[in-house]
From Swiss-Prot, chains A, B:
Classification via PANTHER family: HISTIDINOL-PHOSPHATE AMINOTRANSFERASE, HISTIDINOL-PHOSPHATE AMINOTRANSFERASE 2
Catalytic activity: L-histidinol phosphate + 2-oxoglutarate = 3-(imidazol-4-yl)-2-oxopropyl phosphate + L-glutamate
Protein known as: Histidinol-phosphate aminotransferase
Keywords associated with the record: Amino-acid biosynthesis, Aminotransferase, Histidine biosynthesis, Pyridoxal phosphate, Transferase
Keyword flag Amino-acid biosynthesis: yes
Protein encoded by which gene: hisC
Family statement drawn from the similarity comment of this UniProt entry: Belongs to the class-II pyridoxal-phosphate-dependent aminotransferase family. Histidinol-phosphate aminotransferase subfamily.
Length: 364, 364
């Protein structure tokens, strides 16, 4: 059978290693595995969410309301936008997929920073688009605008805060990039970790309403990180109605589960869980900064729920990640991103204790 | 912004109307709404599944094992195939999407019966492919082979049992169609309702192992119907490893939720719920056949969990569906499929009582 030519050029996304794999491969008991690899919320699941799941555990046979009326109402109140400005995805990932499929083809190019979320490239390659990267992992106006004028990309991705590096781009810089490109280029502002950046520094806070006046900009958000719902797969895109309507043409019906819809609605009701998550995070990340300084390890200042350690030639990120894995500590090796570094999700106090104990031994 | 040209030609799928909509629009209490529109399992959720959901309601923050190791093991045992023969989708729908994206482009055509599952057309149109339909809604060898030779379609869809008509194609006929086309055409055998057909008549039972010797055939199955897990969005494709590997390139990571993965694994453990679902169905569908005969209404003999009534010029499917909707009874109008008919999910005894009471009044 002859497959579409684009398939020749696609590598599949390497997900963070699951606890189950460590259990299977190294015979470590699940309770002894510390997973700091996938930027899951270390507090766990919001008890209010657990309650919603439990009380709806008997409607797994029912399809969700495909209009997602209630969730859109909740999000429109939360972000001060209209229902027609919102599209829901199975994670903001899926909205990235809709965008890619609606806009890209084999004649297109897309522009992103040197090191950023891996799915931008994968979804773009699925459409045969050419990948252009700036020199830096940070989103720098000069680099983006220069590349924009050279390549006229169809899509520019601004991941802020950036994953897997943790740095953020200021609202001012993002708006400058947006103002610097014409209306036929879509600018995707991916705020998957925005709650952490906004809590740390208002200069880096970007809200959908900051962007809604631009017809060629879409804001992406997710329930996976600060809301602690990674396993439920719900994210959203917010943009002008005309753009949302086009993206809807690529949305499959029932693209989130019945329970996912209900928990996302619940998550919109109360910010206290997000606030508690951020408070724990802000307290615990200091330990990672201190540890790095004390051990002569570089790190990128983080605006996210993880921290990125960068190693010099004395340490090898692959060796370190593998050694930790055998000890039941899962972190994210950044070798596949071309970096000699690791991304570590900030865990609970106990998880971080375990990490530091093993990490100190592994690097010594 | 310039969108891909294919978007000009896409209509979005019209999902069955949710209970929430009837509640919102007609002010009917949720408990008084009878939804027989989406072929959901009327027995409800398997209590064993409810238990799994309840006991995992506190891990919504954790991403699923993206290798889906355990689920693939369970499915490979169930169907006597290897892990490498399996791809999991968010419903078998998503596997249809992978297939479409891996194989189709603006130079392709796809072949399907006159009336069949709406998503075949939608996913094909998203890739710009041309839609060819046979004359009949039944999958007839002569019609398929004639159209095959005329159009050389890239994909042939065989939906058996067929949705929204309910008829099934015998294993012999399906194999004849497969043998009649060359290896560059993929034949999709969509068995979303296969459990019902197999229970009714072994001649219509098709198992993945019946098809695995063909490199250009894929079998699709789902947990949404007989397993009663429509709201969890889990389906699968089974084919030769080479084909599965290509489809994997279009699979996004974490494409089903953590709870969906767990419940699908649980569903593979025990067939008694499926058997009970089918037993209820076989008993209740007789009432629909009897009612039709007594009221001079034609119907298509059903191999699925629904029945399709076909009206003559004295009855209008849109008027009838709308009238029932206002009474809180949701069925599926087939006008958008070009049929003056309705598709009714076979409900519980009580649901069917309600349906017959209102339906008798509406058509009188």
């Amino acid at each position: 059978m002859k497959f579409n030519k684009v398939l020749e050029n696609i590598q599949t996304y390497e997900a963070g290693k699951p606890i189950e794999l460590v259990v299977r491969e190294f015979g470590i008991a699940p309770k002894d595995v510390v997973k700091l690899a996938s930027n899951e919320n270390p507090i766990g699941t919001n008890p209010a969410i657990t309650k919603v799941i439990r009380s709806n555990a008997d409607i797994a046979h029912l399809y969700p309301d495909d209009s997602m009326f209630e969730l859109k109402e909740a999000l429109s109140r939360k972000f001060d936008v209209e229902d027609e400005n919102i599209i829901i995805g199975a994670g903001s990932d899926q909205v990235l997929e809709f965008i890619s499929r609606a806009l890209l083809n084999e004649a297109s190019s897309v522009l992103m920073s040197a090191v950023t979320f891996a799915m931008y490239e994968i979804y773009a390659k699925q459409m045969g688009a050419k990948i252009i990267r700036t020199e830096s992992y940070e989103h720098k106006y000069d680099e983006f605008i220069e590349a924009y004028h050279t390549y006229k990309p169809k899509i520019i991705y601004i991941c802020t805060p950036n994953n897997p590096t943790g740095d953020a781009t200021s609202r001012e810089e993002v708006l400058k990039i947006i103002e610097g490109v014409d209306k036929d280029t879509l600018v995707v502002v991916d705020g998957a970790y925005m709650e952490y950046a906004a809590a740390k520094d208002q200069k880096h806070a970007i809200a959908p309403t900051d962007l809604l006046k631009y017809e060629n900009v879409i804001y992406l958000g997710t329930f996976s990180k600060a809301h602690g719902l990674g396993g439920m797969r719900v994210g959203y895109g917010i943009a002008q109605a005309k753009l949302i309507k086009e993206l809807y043409k690529m949305r499959p019906p029932f693209n989130i589960t019945t329970l996912s819809l209900l928990v996302a609605i619940e998550a919109c009701k109360d910010d206290s869980f997000v606030e508690a998550s951020i408070a724990l995070h802000q307290e615990q990340i200091k330990r990672y900064e201190t540890f790095a300084k004390e051990n002569g390890i570089s790190y990128i200042e983080s605006y996210t729920n993880f921290i990125t350690y960068l190693f010099d030639e004395n340490l090898d990120s692959t060796q370190i990640s593998d050694a930790l894995l055998k000890r039941g500590v899962i972190i994210r090796n950044l070798a596949s991103y071309g970096m000699n570094g690791v991304r570590i999700t900030i865990g609970t106090e106990v998880q971080n204790d375990v990490f530091f104990r093993h990490f100190a031994e592994v690097i010594s």
